[in-house]
Amino acid sequence: CGTTSYDFKVSYDGIKTGDVSSKVSVHDPSILKADGEYYIFGSHMSAAKSSDLLNWEKVADGYSKKNPVYGQIYDVADEAFAYSGSKNSLIKTDDKQVHVWAPDVIYNETTGLYYMYYCTTSTWNASNLCYGTSTTPEGPYEWQGALIYSGFNRKTISGTDVLDYVDEDYAYKNYIKGAQYNYEDYPNAIDPTVFYDADGRMWMVYGSWSGGIFLLEIDKTTGLVIHPEADKANNVDPYYGKRLLEAAIFRLRDRISCMMRQAVIIICLCRMAL
């Protein structure tokens, strides 16, 4: 398909501006407003907060059991990193380090809990989307389970839940190409963003690199993904969900718009360092 050019201009009249000098670094952050504070949660178990978006205070940073937001994951490391994300995982990290990336936090109005969706990742296409819950925005977030797997082959697919939703014939025909994962057509399970639509339904958009961006509905009562019925004509996969054309999301005039994660308009959200 072709591309469309838009004349997109923003007026800064009436908008307060200033320099951010607090030197808090949070990579791949999501932003949450709760209890009068703005929170950012990012890769490498980092988090910060601010009351005015200018002055930031570090809440957590670094891979450690003492991390007040993410540290509980080490208590269940055998489960949380079973597939990917550590040197002891089924698919080991390529640098033998722990990798927890790109969290997104949302308040679940049905359960009354804060949900953190994030990925553990080992290689450029072997990742696992997981989630945790907390009663407060600052955590600690208790690991609840794994949601979506990518990067497997015939030997490692047994370490995933893929065959709970599709049969072997479908999995081998679609998800595995030759001796490796079919990364050309299916996603790397990273970079989740969770949101409510105008009808109050909960969704997760995810994926990067590899085969594109996908969308799955979330069960509001559990926080788990809902695997849909296959619908090839509409690009709906029974495991990975609806294939989208582009990436991360924002709300514009009561519509959910999908924008490329690298787009200039959302670089400030997806790739900023404060």
What are these regions (language model features)?
Residues C1-L274:
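Carbohydrate-active catalytic/glycan-binding domains of CAZyme proteins
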